[in-house]
Amino acid sequence: YVNHLFATAKNIAELNMGATTVAAGFLHDSIEDTSVTPEQIEKEFGEEVLFLVEGVTKLGKIRYQGTARYNESLRKLFVAMSQDIRVLIIKLCDRLHNMQTLDAVPREKQLRIAKETLEIYAPIAYRLGIKKLQRDLEDLAFSYVHPKEYAEIKKILKNKKEVIENHLNDFQKNLKKNLLKNGITKFKIDYRVKSLYSLYKKIQKYKGDVESIYDISAIRVTVPEIGDCYRVLGIVHGEWRPLPERIKDYIASPKLNGYRSIHTTIFTGDGAIIEVQIRTEEMHKEAEHGIYA
């Protein structure tokens, strides 16, 4: 029980939420599962922590009962969100630890909890723009709901890993050299590989044609200011040929969940096609941890 509370609080802290939310995360089950009273919480931790703990308690247990009850589950979550977004973030972090320890429960319960996670909790994390949480919830649930497909996607990524990393490392060096040559000195370059569930959905969309998916991996360039993003885009397009239909400016037109970045896909010249994502440090923080962090 205490391990679960620590883990939930840790998950919240990793999203860069404040001390009040972390404290409420540690206490989120206390009213329901212990003899601790609301008055004791308020006396020791203050009115705000109590408000959050009671919010999580009122939200209660959202149980997966098939698609017919899906909208009702979402309604409860959005009511909680309208009262204080932190209540929902605590609930999502609570669910993340439940998923991380799901191997300890019977198969039937595993399947129910994993379906809840995939169909209710992960989409909420997406709507809040908390990419890290969405990714973790989806991949954990995917392994229980579709174990065969999960194993297949892992195998695809494993087989492509070495080739992908070689292309990324070569391109990274060339990109760094070109940015410095053009006067961009403050930047960070890293890369991400598509999450397992995200790749699974993409493969379904392309009817199994993995070779038509150009964003299995992507280079990320992080710069200080918005103007720098467009300067980097100009340098990239000046050096490498872009695929015109794959240039997306989510800075000028953010996604509905608030996501901002520039995406472009280029031919590297050595037979590879690579997606490049360009954003500011603030945008990257928001993309990973949500705009509420």
Give, region by region, the residue ranges found by the protein language model:
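Hydrophobic or amphipathic alpha-helical targeting/insertion segments
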Residues: 28-55, 130
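Nucleic-acid processing machinery
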Residues: 1-14, 23, 61-65, 70-77, ...
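Aromatic/histidine-rich interaction motifs
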Residues: 58
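Conserved catalytic core of nucleotide polymerization and phosphodiester-bond processing enzymes
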Residues: 17
